[in-house]
């Protein structure tokens, strides 16, 4: 436990430096909010603390929040669209609900003050928005009005990851190396927790009865829910070259995990056996995305790689296509209908057609504002 506390202090101290120079880059870091696409509109947080809504077809800026006179805060959370609202958490410690059509502020929680930095993306389930905050508390807010339904204070210190909801249970991983389960019905801890020797870098991913999560000790953990011991840690022989910062994804019994050492690994979910790996040559900060049988990753250098996971791979995978957007990428991205939407660290939005392997759109957010 003492080692975990020492590692936690080191992580909090070094993390801003890692985010600024994840792969040797020298830019000043802003938020790492990624884009989402809903009904032909891209919603994204920008490096300068705005939320923008941009029409994909016309590149027209539909709205931005706050306006040029508003107070801005760093935005690390990717927006969420639910009903007629878009939700976003800020590093200054508020959660905002904005109208889809105009970006008008519907509500803010808390009304005054701060709940501590919101770094992990909130989730919305059954008209409730769940927020993990750096004050060590999970908040449940009414999605329509922003009223507090309940909150649960953990003995975990900072929460910088996104909560995961499966059924009537919420799971959250912490910077001090715990995973907790909370009941959405009784609005409190269920009693099980898992403790590792280092903090968890990624949000927990639930697949069947197991949790998969990356740690600052440079291992990826597989944990059976309810157990106090891990099923396996990956790599099996020695730690990886860096952190498993991005959350993995699991599909048909295979875990796909990107690492800051630049490697993408396919791992057998039950045994932890490595099936294949790919060396991107640059840190993988964003979680992979699966579209049908195509697995998509971006690395910090701005290269998009596409793999066909329906084919057998031996030891080292070879991507079907690679495309460089020419800008570094540290935020999540989204994919739909054969297109990948990326927000670069140059504050531009890129659209990549993965079928032809080309950038079909790319424009600065500032240009959209002038259109």
What function would you assign to each model-found segment?
Residues 1-9:
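Bacterial N-terminal signal peptides that target proteins for export
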Residues 9-18:
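Bacterial N-terminal signal peptides
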Residues 22-38, 64-80, 105-125, 148-166, ...:
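Extracytoplasmic beta-rich repeat domains
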Residues 46, 90, 133, 174-175, ...:
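Structural signature of WD-repeat beta-propellers
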Residues 49, 93, 136, 177-178, ...:
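Short coil/turn segments within WD40 beta-propeller repeats
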């Amino acid at each position: 436990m003492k080692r975990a506390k020492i590692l936690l202090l080191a992580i909090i101290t070094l993390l801003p430096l890692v985010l600024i120079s994840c792969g040797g880059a020298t830019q000043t870091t802003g938020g790492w909010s990624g884009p989402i696409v809903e009904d032909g509109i891209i919603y994204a947080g920008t490096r300068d603390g705005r939320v923008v809504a941009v029409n994909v077809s016309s590149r027209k800026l539909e709205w931005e929040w706050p306006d040029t006179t508003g107070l801005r805060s760093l935005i690390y959370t990717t927006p969420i669209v639910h009903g007629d609202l878009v939700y976003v958490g800020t590093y200054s410690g508020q959660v905002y609900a904005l109208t889809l059509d105009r970006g008008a502020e519907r509500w803010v929680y808390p009304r005054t003050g701060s709940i501590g930095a919101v770094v992990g993306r909130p989730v919305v389930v059954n008209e409730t928005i769940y927020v993990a905050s750096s004050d060590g508390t999970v908040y449940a807010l009414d999605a329509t009005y922003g009223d507090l339904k309940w909150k649960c204070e953990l003995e975990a210190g900072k929460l910088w990851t996104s909560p995961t909801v499966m059924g009537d249970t919420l799971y959250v991983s912490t910077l001090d190396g715990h995973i907790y389960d909370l009941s959405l019905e009784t609005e409190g801890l269920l009693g099980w927790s898992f403790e590792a020797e280092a903090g968890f870098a990624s949000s927990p991913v639930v697949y069947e009865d197991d949790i998969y999560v990356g740690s600052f000790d440079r291992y990826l953990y597989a944990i059976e829910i309810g157990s106090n011991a891990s099923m396996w840690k990956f790599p099996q022989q020695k730690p990886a070259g860096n952190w498993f910062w991005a959350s993995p994804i699991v599909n048909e019994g295979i875990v796909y995990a990107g690492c800051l050492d630049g490697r993408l690994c396919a791992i057998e979910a039950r045994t932890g056996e490595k099936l294949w790996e790919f060396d991107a040559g640059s840190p993988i900060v964003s979680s992979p995305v699966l579209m049908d049988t195509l697995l998509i990753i971006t690395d910090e250098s701005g290269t998009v790689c596409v793999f066909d996971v329906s084919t057998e791979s031996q030891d080292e995978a070879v991507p079907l296509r690679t495309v460089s957007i020419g800008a570094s990428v540290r935020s999540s991205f989204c994919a739909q209908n054969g297109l990948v939407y990326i927000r670069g660290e140059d504050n531009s939005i890129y659209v990549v057609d993965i079928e032809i392997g080309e950038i079909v759109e790319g424009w600065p957010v500032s240009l959209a504002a002038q259109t």
